Amino acid sequence: MAAAGPRPTALISFRSPDEGVPALHLAFGAARQTLRAMVPAEVVPLLARVDALARAGAWCVGYLHYEASAAFDAAFDAHAPSDATRPLAAFAVYDGPLAGADADAAWGASADVAVEWSGGPKREAFNGAIAEILRAIADGELYQVNATAPLLGTLRGDALALFAALRRAQPNAYAAYLDLGQGLPDDRFLSVSPELFFDWRDGRLLARPMKGTAPRGADAADDAAQAEFLRSAPKERAENLMIVDLLRNDLSRIAEPHSVQVPRLFHTEAWPTVWQMSSDVVARPRPGIALADVFGALFPCGSITGAPKVQAMRLIKRIEAEPRGVYCGAIGVVQPGGAATFNVPIRTLALRDDGATTHVRCGIGSGITADATAAGEWDEWRHKRAFVDRASQAFELLETLRLEQGVVEEAAAHLERMAGAARHFGFAPPAAAAARTLAAVVAAHPRGTWRVRLLADRAGDARAEAFELAPSPPLVRVQVARTPLIGADGEFVRFKTTRRAHYDAFAPRDPELFDTLLWNERGELTEFTRGNVALRLDGQWLTPALRCGLLPGVARARLLREGRLREAVIHKHDLARADGLAFFNSLRGWVDARCVLAPRGG
């Protein structure tokens, strides 16, 4: 639970937006007042009031909904708000941030928390929206549209604890927690956005539109290849350049002549679940430009509309059934003196209470250009939701080892794999604690054969469980999954953790069956739920390639090094011509298998 102290109404943890600009890590308690704009006509006066208060020495923290765009241009078409009792924009005004123990307490949430996700886009509707966008692009209506679809769920636990989990899952972001209702109807917002909307200080305005995405790789080599693909892919570069041109045009409306520049183009950056591409656009605002003028020129950010902006927003309204809310709007802080930093609230959750339940909404989107495909955009949507999957439920790192007659087999390889998972998920290094824990297990079980479950938590602490292991039968009966494993390329497949619901769903119901053979959405075999798979085809033992989506098993790596296995892409239909099938892992070794249920399709 959070430590005792005043419950924060706002938390801001913004990375440094530019060289020489300090990062922000601020907690705020009760506001001295909260400014709210309920309709578009009230938004510009609200921003003028925020600007004046900040220049007089106040801290102002707040947000604008995407639907506040009508305040700046009547041609910006968006849905009406879903609830007229909640503001389009709101800013809390503070004398200063919390300090000392109160600040520490505000950031101290650590309770277990979970989000139960129950709804997302339907594939048919998603494909239909992409098709409509591509038709509009082909007809010359526009060049690019940022299409979004929400993920819906319910929160079990405390919102501050969820925000802490989100920050662990998406570190080094422009993160914000806002609870500005102060007794009036309002949602709570939890943002861990990687995208800077703008930073304005000392006569310089910096915008950093983010467009272009690639998934993180299955291993270091694949990860480097994904980064290089993103840097050089024509679709991703075109997507980014269109928005850079849009932002240059937007900034020119308030900039001194010839001051708009692009000092950095097509910069790629690694985030926990994806690679992202961004570019920098800078300008010197003309004298007399105020905060409302900056929003008037830039809002909503072109990266989350498309180009041209007016036409893109009209199409967005047609294909998206509901208002976006704060998602794709702006969240930020205006400091005493007027320096302002705002994010684009992607990777952002909106929480709404109905008395008994806290409903969670998370928008996820991508830029659609002429060469987009529905399948590719669907994959991108899934990759982008991975950050919230990681934060939605606590988990531990897991290794399963064979302890036989006082010796842990391939212990070093297992510990190395656990260390790699810790680096990926941002856990404290578990190596020392894991080694001590294994030594204690060995001392307690010097005889016999044991299955050891070694677990490590986020703090790097380790624990272990040991169970007697019966000999494996010489031949096991297995089945083939009736449906594909959705998201076989996800991080909870590539790394071994206690998050195994995606495997448990395929566990055989028949106790006579040993395991289930899985396959991905392309019809490629991947692995069993508890081990790797090998097929003998044309006299050669083959195992699925990592890019098909599977755990890089310790035994698998050894057999590949020894030349006893070769990697390949193996399809379901290859089972019919295989003259050998095996289950294997470092716990049970090599076990011959026989498929008793034929796959459907493929």
Question: Where are the regions that the model predicts?
Answer:
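Extended alpha-helical targeting/anchoring segments
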Residues: M1-L397, E404, N520
